[in-house]
Amino acid sequence: MAYKGFDLTGKVALVTGGNGGIGLGMADALAEAGADVCIWGTRKEKTDAAAEKLKRHGRKVHAQIVDVGDEKQVIDAFAETVKVLGHVDNCVANAGVSGRGKGSILEMDYEEWRRVTRVNLDGVFFTFRAAAKHMVERGKGGSLVAMASTAAIEGAARSSHYGASKGGVCAMVRALAVELARYKISVNSILPGWIETEMTANAFGNPKFAGNVMPRIPERRWGVGADFGPLAVYLASDATKYTTGRDFVIDGGYTLF
């Protein structure tokens, strides 16, 4: 008999940036495990296509166009999610932008700094605040999951804004884990390594880059969005009622070196 702790039937999950890559990999697994799913994205055609793909699991699926760096958009979008799907049990703040190779601190201007931090850090704060208020008011607990990065725990030149945004997410997660535990809300983060997504396509297609990075990955492959599905289900399930404030690294062993 299958372990019932991972059954998400009756639960509702929200995944920001859920229209591709890691986000879609998680949303797909959550729907397969029985959850109704809402995905947020910034491109309508791509987001609608992702929603259609998710519907094959027979669950309710809702798609919205949202810039998570805009506080009002997040507040309004979350209210719509609840109106359409009834409530939210699991919120995955996955939406993010890349900052790698955009300039050293000697060259970077404030506009570039804010381009990254408004989405990667402010966006998580806005999303988590909306979700936490809803979960506390509902009184049935819940799960918050933030997408950080291995950039939060290791240095990478020319990406101080990206590393700072992801390191900030990890610090936020630990603080909120303590703050929200009394409401039976768990808060955890996921730290991806080198994952094949739209954002990394150019870098991975560079033979010099791939030749430098791939030998440092014990698994000898790039990660893919589907690698994050099982963890998303685990963190959304009742199996993690006593797990909070943790950083889960998915990097094929990259940070072991």
Model-derived regions, located:
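Short C-terminal tail/terminal secondary-structure segment
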Residues: 2-5, 102, 154, 233, ...
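Conserved glycine-rich cofactor-binding loop
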Residues: 19-20, 43
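Short, small/polar-rich loop/turn modules that mediate ligand/substrate recognition or access, typified
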Residues: 92, 181, 186, 243-245
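Substrate-binding pocket helix/loop in short-chain dehydrogenase/reductase
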Residues: 102-105, 109-117, 213
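Active-site helix of classical SDR
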Residues: 128, 165, 173
